[in-house]
């Protein structure tokens, strides 16, 4: 006998067996519709079998929410189900069986900051393109490549980057944000917010409102290197069949001296996550470490603060404690005989390709600065050179002039940071961090606009023209900056990266852009067309006319313009 449920409960119940609501059985599918549960009975060898089936109630078809799915008609004379024999019990009129699709992305998760922990495989990128919109603060994900870490971790087109690791970057220069992401390779934690949510928050709270959750000062996971002594590593692991695991320290033991906090949660061993390890697997991993081991741990305060903020306990957030080695920052000033070293591209001891320093001459600037033969070059002027070819790396060094800042690691440090899968640039001491040259940028195209400037000294159309074809470099950049003056005649090249695609194609500072991919430049849609260039298939075809630097300086007073990035960078 079927009895109606109490008011407010959309399920039907039998005296036996007990029937749950549809949401209990199938979960909330965020359809925005009330559900009732139809009871379907069928005959088989065991007799009658009853199974609940969720059915949406009739609703006004004209009332829809943009985030809700459109449902089929809910009233029908068809039978509910015919999977196991002829149905013998159901609703009247009979309602069709509606099979819910898989869970769509939670729309509410897009309304708050999200955390994407990306990892990069050797020779590949994180899998997304970053762009700064013209005339607006912030940095936008303009494309996510399928099958990449960015896609797997939920990064979406239109997301705005609020923070890189624990550093808020929303109001930083575009080039600085690109530099931070590249310097964090092979792992980076991005805090992002969907574009529509960001726009609403800014409209309601103002441009200076703090939208990004970050850890407090000194509250960060720790990367601790422990060397075994007569008492072992100086910790034991809480017993359980599977992670998570917490550490119990021996007073005065090796772990305590290495900076492991009391009651710390164990996250990684030698760069490998132990979150899903069994206790036996963890024991074996520690035993295989030999006489020393590197642990990523989080103290109780860090764990609690991350839980409250929703932050993952991610390795790129870590600070180093008692590390066996660290990167070195070398400052060189060229002498009469040069810098005194040779840069060579080769594979390291671990098989990874890179740029290595050899033939360090005694008595010359490189040796005096502390360079050692066999050092791997990590960065030039604070900018990572990972993934760059030999020629582009040489060009970056030459572009620094007579004073060069190089970040290097010796073979031991190279092996260590490769093992823990973290960039050595994350562990530079603040006093050693090299300052990047002012105005440097990884953006491939930049637009400058200052309506206060007037062109009074040069003709509007330069004479002569030539055509250049450009292909993007390893970082997705064409290697030049494009500027203009609102009242000036044309767009012009304001900077060319040495060794980049633009330099190889023959672009020079002062060249004026006449055409881009066959379209004349000089109309009202120039900026819109430039913003679409990152999506265009290479090569980039530019028709140029030369202008002398003298004429350029007369046209644009030094320091009179401000750059906005237009094109995207592959990260």
Curated annotation (Swiss-Prot):
InterPro entries: NHER, PDZ, PDZ_sf. It is a peripheral membrane protein. The modification Phosphoserine is found at residue 395. One of its GO terms (molecular function) is ion channel inhibitor activity. Residues 433-444 have a biased composition (Low complexity). Keywords: Cell membrane, Cytoplasm, Membrane, Phosphoprotein, Repeat. Its main location: membrane. Residues 52-72, 432-459 are annotated as: Disordered. It is found in: Cell membrane; Cytoplasm. Interacts with the C-terminal region of GUCY2C. Interacts with the C-terminal region SLC9A3 and the interactions decrease in response to elevated calcium ion levels. Interacts with the C-terminal region of SLC34A1. Interacts with USP2 isoform 4. Interacts (via the third PDZ domain) with SLC26A3 (via PDZ-binding motif); interaction leads to decreased expression of SLC26A3 on the cell membrane resulting in its reduced exchanger activity. This is Na(+)/H(+) exchange regulatory cofactor NHE-RF4. The lineage of its organism: Eukaryota, Metazoa, Chordata, Craniata, Vertebrata.
């Amino acid at each position: 006998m079927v009895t109606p449920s109490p008011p407010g409960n959309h399920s039907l119940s039998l005296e036996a067996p007990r029937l749950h609501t549809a949401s209990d059985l199938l979960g909330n599918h965020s359809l925005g519709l009330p559900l009732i549960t139809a009871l379907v009975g069928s005959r088989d060898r065991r007799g009658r079998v009853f199974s609940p089936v969720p059915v949406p109630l009739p609703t006004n078809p004209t009332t829809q929410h943009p985030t809700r799915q459109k449902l089929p008609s809910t009233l029908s004379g068809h039978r509910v189900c015919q999977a196991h024999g002829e149905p013998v019990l159901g609703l009247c009129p009979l309602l069709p069986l509606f099979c819910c699709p898989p869970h769509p992305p939670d729309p509410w998760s897009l309304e708050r900051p999200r955390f994407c922990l990306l990892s990069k495989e050797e020779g590949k990128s994180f899998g997304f393109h970053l762009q700064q919109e013209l005339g607006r603060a912030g940095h936008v994900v303009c494309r996510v490549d399928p099958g990449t870490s960015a896609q797997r971790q939920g990064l979406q087109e239109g997301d705005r980057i609020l923070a890189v690791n624990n550093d808020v970057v929303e109001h930083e220069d575009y080039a600085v944000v690109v530099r931070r992401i590249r310097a964090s390779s092979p792992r980076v934690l991005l805090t992002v917010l969907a574009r529509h949510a960001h726009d609403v928050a800014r409209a309601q709270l103002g441009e200076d409102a703090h939208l990004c959750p970050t850890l407090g000062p000194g509250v960060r996971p720790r990367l601790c290197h422990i060397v075994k002594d007569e008492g072992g590593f100086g910790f034991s692991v809480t017993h359980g069949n599977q992670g998570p695991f917490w550490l119990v320290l021996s007073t005065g033991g090796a772990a305590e001296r290495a900076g492991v906090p009391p009651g710390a949660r164990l996250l990684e061993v030698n760069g490998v996550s132990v979150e899903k390890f069994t206790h036996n697997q963890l024991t074996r991993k520690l035993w295989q470490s030999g006489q020393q081991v590197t642990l990523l741990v989080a103290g109780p305060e860090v764990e609690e603060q991350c839980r409250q903020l929703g932050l993952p306990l991610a390795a790129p957030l870590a600070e180093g404690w008692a590390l066996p080695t660290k990167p070195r920052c070398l400052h060189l000033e060229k002498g009469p005989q040069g810098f005194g070293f040779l840069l060579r591209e080769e594979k390291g001891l671990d098989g990874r390709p890179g740029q290595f320093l050899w033939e360090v001459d005694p008595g010359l600037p490189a040796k005096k600065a502390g360079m050692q033969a066999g050092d791997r070059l990590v960065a030039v002027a604070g900018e990572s050179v990972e993934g760059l070819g030999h020629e582009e790396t040489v060009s970056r060094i030459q572009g620094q002039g007579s004073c060069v800042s190089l970040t290097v690691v010796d073979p031991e440090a190279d092996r260590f940071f490769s093992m823990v899968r973290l960039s050595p640039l994350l562990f530079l001491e603040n006093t050693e961090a090299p300052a990047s040259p002012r105005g440097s940028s990884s953006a491939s195209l930049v637009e400058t606009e200052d309506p206060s400037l007037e062109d009074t000294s040069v003709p509007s159309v330069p004479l002569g023209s030539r055509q250049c074809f450009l292909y993007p470099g390893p970082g997705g950049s064409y290697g030049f900056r494009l500027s203009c003056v609102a009242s000036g005649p044309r767009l012009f090249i304001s900077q060319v990266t040495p060794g980049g695609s633009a330099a190889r194609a023959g672009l020079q500072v002062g060249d004026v852009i006449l055409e881009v991919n066959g379209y004349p430049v000089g109309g009202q849609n120039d900026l819109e067309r430039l913003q679409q260039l990152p999506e265009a298939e290479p090569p980039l075809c530019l028709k140029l006319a030369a202008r002398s630097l003298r004429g350029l300086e007369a046209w644009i007073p030094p320091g009179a313009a401000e750059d906005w990035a237009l094109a995207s960078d592959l990260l």
